From Swiss-Prot:
Purpose: Non catalytic subunit of RNase H2, an endonuclease that specifically degrades the RNA of RNA:DNA hybrids. Participates in DNA replication, possibly by mediating the removal of lagging-strand Okazaki fragment RNA primers during DNA replication. Mediates the excision of single ribonucleotides from DNA:RNA duplexes.
Residue list for modification N-acetylalanine: 2
Name of the encoding gene: RNASEH2B
CDD domains: RNase_H2-B
Tissue: Widely expressed.
UniProt subunit comment: The RNase H2 complex is a heterotrimer composed of the catalytic subunit RNASEH2A and the non-catalytic subunits RNASEH2B and RNASEH2C.
Domain of life: Eukaryota
Main location: nucleus
Organism: Homo sapiens
Family according to the record: Belongs to the RNase H2 subunit B family.
Keyword Nucleus found: yes
Record's protein name: Ribonuclease H2 subunit B
High-level lineage: Eukaryota, Metazoa, Chordata, Craniata, Vertebrata
Length: 312
């Protein structure tokens, strides 16, 4: 699916290529604003990020971008530079609501949700309140109060204890999905955490939990991620048990140290080796030939000839 966006530069609409499910394409046909791109807060960084709302089914999707250098798209009769591939994946809106609940918790009181989810920078956050089943979702991360005799409003307050239990379930669900899809995570955990080879092989279940924790941490604040790590009783990565130097993975920008002496393949060393090697019978016969009057092949590639070549 290619979507046109006017960049306002007079060049025309810039097109973006999206990989979406068929039912999302149908939503754009049923309603004029069936699919809506909005800028909302990233619950991990607090910065802005692009999300996709399915207004027909009231669903929220995060927009991811896959990019490589020197790629372009051929769209109908045009060429779109950049070669970016956008794809939309469902995201639990509770992750975004957590950002506002944690922020409102500093006031230390119960509040109605429409007073909690308020953002002058990202005003479209009110769309989160229109998502179905919101009250059931909030039950996982908040304490609730309400008096039906006075009004039908409910008041919410962030609960860290409930949130950690909910996040633990998310981690367990992620672990199950990783195993079902036969995703090998031990090498990834080992390379990022500097675990020894023996430790990574014996703690396979822990590797899955640690990797799942890392995935979930992309949707929650850093402080909450640290609390979740403690709640899951994940040990701190051990830097005191490195692998042998020949197997150690370097995570710096510096090149990995060579395991062999590659200098033996240098041109200078090869010439020296040729001089020291014994001459064959043919080479000895060639050495006895009278070379007077002959020009060395190097003369054809001397300084003068190089200048001529440079002028061409």
């Amino acid at each position: 699916m290619a979507a046109g966006v006017d960049c306002g530069d007079g060049v025309g609409a810039r097109q973006h290529v999206f990989l979406v499910s068929e039912y999302l394409k149908d939503a754009s046909k049923k309603m004029k604003n069936g699919l809506m791109f909005v800028k909302l807060v990233n619950p991990c960084s607090g910065e802005g990020a692009i999300y996709l709302f399915n207004m027909c089914l009231q669903q929220l999707f995060e927009v991811k971008v896959f990019k490589e250098k020197h790629h372009s798209w051929f769209i109908n009769q045009s060429v779109q530079s950049g070669g970016l591939l956008h794809f939309a994946t469902p995201v639990d809106p509770l992750f975004l609501l957590l950002h506002y609940l944690i922020k409102a918790d500093k006031e230390g009181k119960f509040q109605p949700l429409d007073q909690v989810v308020v953002d002058n920078v990202f005003p479209n956050c009110i769309l989160l309140l229109k998502l179905p089943g919101l009250e059931k979702l909030l039950h996982h991360v908040t304490e609730e109060k309400g008096n039906p005799e006075i009004d039908n409003k409910k008041y919410y307050k962030y609960s860290k204890e409930k949130t950690l239990k909910w996040l633990e379930k998310k981690v367990n669900q992620t672990v199950a999905a990783l195993k079902t899809n036969n995703v090998n995570v031990s090498s990834r955990v080992q390379s990022t955490a500097f675990f020894s080879g023996d430790q990574a092989s014996t703690d396979k279940e822990e590797d899955y939990i640690r990797y799942a924790h890392g995935l979930i941490s992309d949707y929650i604040p850093k402080e909450l991620s640290d609390d979740l790590s403690k709640y899951l009783k994940l040990p701190e990565p051990s830097a005191s048990l490195p692998n042998p130097p020949s197997k150690k993975i370097k995570l710096s920008d510096e090149p990995v140290e060579a395991k062999e002496d590659y200098t033996k393949f240098n041109t200078k060393d090869l010439k020296t080796e040729k001089k020291n090697s014994k001459m064959t019978a043919a080479q000895k016969a060639l050495a006895k030939v009278d070379k007077s009057g002959m020009k060395s092949i190097d003369t054809f590639f001397g300084v003068k000839n190089k200048k001529k070549i440079g002028k061409v």
